[in-house]
Amino acid sequence: MAAPSYQLLVVDDSKRDTLLLERILQQASDATFTVTHMESAKAGLEELSAQAYDLVLLDYYLPDMDGLAFLEEKQQRGLTAPVIMLTAFGQERLPVAALQAGALDYFRKDQVNSSLLGKAIQQAIEKARLQESAAADAARLRELEETVARLQQQLKEQQKS
């Protein structure tokens, strides 16, 4: 069975950190990752609007907006790619804030390794796909319920005639 292949968008102003992430991802032997890099949040949002990605690896500290503002803007634009947030600095409340803002996971860059990141990416992508599938199923169920209600109403009207 072929290894899964994923399209990733890395939004990070540090080329060095991006190269390090790419090396870490290459070591994740159970998947293939194609990486596109954007150096600012605004460029990342524009790229995400123009191209479909399986996942976004997002640095928290960016020159034009922080990761939480990125997540808010992403949601306002209706962009659905899952996000894993990364930061070089640990802040006590940031992981909770990131998850509440819509990130599916959060890591400090100095704690990331190929096994951890590879698994986190695959799990985040799978979770996002399951959420999309559940939303589609819920929408289909609502449609069916509306159809049943309409048919019941038609049946009642026919029985009266």
Model-found features: residue ranges?
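Receiver (REC) domain switch/output surface
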Residues: 116-129
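Active-site residues of response regulator receiver
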Residues: 12, 59, 87
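Two-component/phosphorelay signaling modules centered on CheY-like receiver
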Residues: 15-36
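Acidic catalytic/metal-coordinating carboxylates
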Residues: 40, 66-69
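The feature encodes the CheY-like receiver
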Residues: 63, 91
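Short amphipathic alpha-helix used as the core "switch/output" element in two-component signaling
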Residues: 27, 46, 68-80, 97
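Acidic, metal-coordinating helix/loop segments flanking the phosphotransfer/catalytic sites
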Residues: 22, 37-55
